[in-house]
Amino acid sequence: MGFRIVDNFLNQKSLDNLSKKFNLLKKDNIPVMWFEEDYNNNVFLKEASKIYDFSKYKGFEQWSHNNTQCDPHIDKDEGYFKKTLGKLKFPICSIIFYVEVKNLKGGQLKLEDDTITPKSNRLVIFDPGIYHSVEKFKGTRRTYLINPWNYKPKTFNYETI
């Protein structure tokens, strides 16, 4: 199992801009959305492309967790999983960016046998097919999540954004 952690990933201005967007959401989350754009135009995807093969990249899905719990799961094509009654297809990798972490008790990211402590401005990129979850927590824990794909997942059967 592989993962990479990059601390202080964004410069302060970029981090502040992302934090402002989260503040506007209040307690809501960014809904899961599909985008088809060059990965070189997205700092998170560009970083992931340094360690994962993006030669067949088609687009990415993004969403957020704004102080929300995450039960154990594997990032997968949910539409394909439902349609095939349990078969799995995975993204290129999974990307978690900690936008804001304050006064946190608990809330560690569990990657099978590894535990990662959340920290503001921390980027975590990990291999596809890994069970992961978030321990119960109190405090502020805001994350921005991205899954890049080599195809458009069956989950997204509407128009491309």
Placement of each model-derived feature along the sequence:
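Catalytic core of non-heme Fe(II) oxygenases with the double-stranded beta-helix
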Residues: K56-I161
